[in-house]
Amino acid sequence: MNVGDNSNFFVIKAKENGVNVFGMTRGTDTRFHHSEKLDKGEVMIAQFTEHTSAVKIRGKAIIQTSYGTLDTEKDE
């Protein structure tokens, strides 16, 4: 991972209590390897790494990435 590469970072802001964030592994078997629970207003800054290839978010949240901003409540 290139430390100067900001595209690997993303921000999750909870819009309600109990938003679940799951980190998923790379490899032939995709597995959950980390989970966090965020309450309303809490912000998590995370990044993709050699171990994390995907993130699943359950609940109402805003996700900001280098590609733009997503709202889990809105259909694009």
UniProtKB/Swiss-Prot annotation:
This is Transcription attenuation protein MtrB. Oligomer of 11 identical subunits arranged in doughnut-like structure. The gene is mtrB. The keyword Nucleus does not apply. Belongs to the MtrB family. Required for transcription attenuation control in the Trp operon. This trans-acting factor seems to recognize a 10 bases nucleotide sequence in the Trp leader transcript causing transcription termination. Binds the leader RNA only in presence of L-tryptophan. GO terms for biological process: DNA-templated transcription termination; regulation of DNA-templated transcription. SUPFAM superfamilies: TRAP-like.
